[in-house]
């Protein structure tokens, strides 16, 4: 048995596989699973009762986690003139227009989030095939296509999490670091679940959240009580 397999097996003993955990106990339990040599991320996974092949059942949006994500985020902004100045003053790491698009075309993407003003989306479209697969394409639904670039930069720097359901109806997100307090993780988790519930498509039928789990980067997952999640609004 490898060292990693043995570690994973030991962690499984701390989880009741027949139980659906309420948020408070789920958080306190995953905190006991920290075993890596780095500050692991607390991750939530949701299986939604939607069929994203239909446009009216797509779940996509963003939420600013009240206690942040614990990650340093590099933000790039495609803007000109006064809007470029606003972005710089708000703390954007990279600001440009044609020059920034040229760098992206060369494969130089030293940023985690890309924001653009609506009038320059035609320019951004030139590199859409590069940005899209990396999840970096600006989008109005995540607040990254906007004239309020200062607010968008602040959101990105202060814990904005973008979410989008995949083809199987799954959504994954990081809720912060395991070093966060119980209260911080609970606040972040509640905010994220509220956002998911808020984005429930009108066309979605039946039980919206089919199942859910919580884990750390390097830990097994535990099942969450979906009724509590559905009631978090």
UniProtKB/Swiss-Prot annotation:
Record's keyword terms, sorted: Repressor, Ribonucleoprotein, Ribosomal protein, RNA-binding, rRNA-binding, Translation regulation, tRNA-binding
MF (Gene Ontology): rRNA binding; structural constituent of ribosome; tRNA binding
Keyword Cell inner membrane assigned: no
InterPro entries: Ribosom_uL1_bac-type (IPR005878), Ribosomal_uL1 (IPR002143), Ribosomal_uL1-like (IPR023674), Ribosomal_uL1/biogenesis (IPR028364), Ribosomal_uL1_3-a/b-sand (IPR016095), Ribosomal_uL1_CS (IPR023673)
Top-level taxonomic group: Bacteria
Gene Ontology cellular component annotations, sorted alphabetically: cytosolic large ribosomal subunit
GO biological process terms, semicolon-separated: regulation of translation; translation
Described purpose of this protein according to its UniProt entry: Binds directly to 23S rRNA. The L1 stalk is quite mobile in the ribosome, and is involved in E site tRNA release.
Similarity comment text for this entry: Belongs to the universal ribosomal protein uL1 family.
Subunit and partners: Part of the 50S ribosomal subunit.
The name this protein goes by in its record: Large ribosomal subunit protein uL1
Species of provenance: Campylobacter lari (strain RM2100 / D67 / ATCC BAA-1060)
Gene that this sequence comes from: rplA
């Amino acid at each position: 048995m490898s060292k990693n397999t043995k570690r994973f097996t030991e962690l499984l003993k701390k989880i009741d596989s027949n139980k659906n955990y309420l948020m408070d106990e789920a958080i306190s339990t995953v905190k006991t699973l920290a075993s890596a040599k780095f500050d692991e991320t607390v991750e939530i996974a949701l299986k939604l009762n939607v069929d994203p092949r239909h446009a009216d059942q797509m779940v996509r949006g963003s939420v600013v986690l009240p206690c942040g994500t614990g990650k340093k985020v590099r933000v790039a902004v495609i803007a000109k003139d006064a809007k470029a100045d606003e972005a710089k003053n708000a703390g954007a790491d990279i600001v440009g227009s044609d020059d920034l698009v040229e760098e992206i075309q060369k494969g130089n993407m030293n940023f985690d989030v890309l924001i653009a003003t609506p009038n320059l989306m035609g320019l951004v479209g030139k590199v859409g095939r590069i940005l899209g697969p990396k999840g970096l394409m600006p989008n109005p639904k995540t607040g990254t296509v906007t004239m309020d670039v200062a607010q968008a930069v602040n959101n990105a720097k202060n814990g904005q999490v973008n979410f989008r359901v995949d083809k199987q109806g799954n959504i994954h997100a990081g809720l912060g670091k395991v070093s966060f307090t119980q209260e911080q993780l609970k606040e972040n988790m509640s905010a994220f679940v509220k956002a998911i519930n808020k984005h429930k498509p009108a066309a979605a039928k039946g039980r919206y959240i089919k199942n859910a789990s919580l884990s750390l980067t390097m830990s097994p997952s535990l099942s969450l009580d979906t009724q509590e999640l559905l009631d978090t609004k």
